């Protein structure tokens, strides 16, 4: 009789466990989906911020070129566009600032506007590493940066990442100065202000992993 009762209890426990798992499977799947969506949303926001900073800096460079070619109106248009890109209040700049980097202006922050990945200078070619680099390039072409980095890491290939950082407040100030000078038709001085914005960019190199 005891065996029958125990068997019945075990069956009941197993049955309830199955029901619990079935009931919670959609919840777990939903949570995982939400996490993936949040990660994608964060990555998209960071990418948008980088693009805004990069486009603003391109506008600065082309504005200087326009001044060189005697087209101040085009330079003014591009400078205003760059300023608008960096003054977008809907953008959460601080959330995606590069931490731990000292800036020249108080309360400033560096924003990553571009990045490049390369092999470390100590790299020594071997057939295995060359094969890993080929596979990594294929994965990068498909947008799988994480997979590409893992391929290189497993093959013992040292990788460096160069991040191009823009001091947000300093660049905004330089653009504001350039706008005022362009309005006053002080084009030489405006060019220097734009150059100051361009010169504020720094390159931060970091070893992702070493061989």
UniProtKB/Swiss-Prot annotation:
Write the signal peptide boundaries.
1-21
What keywords are annotated for this sequence in UniProt? Signal
**Transmembrane helix: is it a keyword of this entry?**
no
Pfam families per UniProt: YfdX
Q: Which gene encodes it?
A: yfdX
InterPro entries recorded: Uncharacterised_YfdX
Q: Which cysteines are joined by disulfide bonds?
A: none
Q: What is this protein called?
A: Protein YfdX
